[in-house]
Regions:
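Extreme N-terminal starter segment of soluble prokaryotic enzymes
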Residues: 1-4
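Short acidic, Gly/Ser-rich segments with clustered Asp/Glu that frequently serve as metal-coordination loops
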Residues: 8-18
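Alpha-helix initiation/capping motif
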Residues: 19, 70-73, 140, 163
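Metal-dependent phosphoesterase core characteristic of DEDDh/y 3'-5' exonuclease domains
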Residues: 23-28, 32-63, 86-205
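Metal-dependent phosphoesterase signature
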Residues: 61-84
Length: 205
């Protein structure tokens, strides 16, 4: 079994068709770990925005991604995630991200671009943040913590200026996960996403 830790960087856009705000994915990064938790492959891709062509100042300040960089190296969402699904070899892996907010954004983008929230290649998912937090003894209220804070607690060296780029965040998340991985303890955190989990994630009564 492989593990794929992915991270998304998104831009705040306004979906005029739905008359609501939307977090539009601009970059995806991922690392693949084998059963010995060795990084065996990486994935990184910029995505051409369709909902809003303008990158917000906050997005540019946080990621240091420029409009020219996106224009020169970006590809459409559908193509990017076809490539990602092919790269992941999804049948035998558990997907992870740092908190399920990435999962929520991914489902929202799938719903916008394909009219259905289900992410077909993602069968199993685990929240790496939630799993790692169980090992923090000084967090009695179980408050969510940032990736950088968790790395600090686990005594993992992090270059702050490299954070908030998708692939770099994946390297840090992988290092945190490797510090505390135990197959028996991790197993209950794996969710089956083969049904209507994504639709339920986005359901608003």
């Amino acid at each position: 079994m492989n593990f794929v830790i992915f991270d998304l960087e998104w831009n705040n856009a306004y979906n005029y068709k739905a008359q609501t705000g939307m977090n539009e994915i601009i970059e995806i990064g991922a690392v693949m770990l084998d059963e010995r938790l060795q990084i065996v492959d990486t994935f990184k891709q910029l995505i051409l925005p369709k909902v809003s062509k303008r990158l917000t100042g906050r997005f540019k300040d946080l990621t240091h991604i420029t409009p020219d960089e996106v224009k020169q190296n970006g590809i459409p969402f559908e193509e990017a995630f076809r490539d990602f699904a092919r790269w992941s070899g999804a049948d035998n892996c558990v997907f992870m991200s740092w908190s399920d907010s990435d999962l929520y954004v991914l489902a929202g983008n799938y719903k916008y671009f394909s009219q259905r929230a289900h992410v077909p290649f993602m069968q199993r998912y685990a929240d790496a943040q939630k799993y790692c937090m169980r090992f923090l003894t000084d967090n009695p209220n179980n408050n969510q913590i940032s990736l950088a804070h968790c790395a600090e607690k686990f005594q993992i060296s992090v270059e702050e200026e490299n954070l908030h780029r998708a692939l770099e965040d994946c390297y840090v998340a992988a290092a945190c996960f490797k510090k505390v991985y135990d197959p028996a303890l991790f197993e209950p955190y794996i969710c089956d996403c083969s049904g209507d989990d994504f639709e339920r994630l986005l359901y608003k009564p």
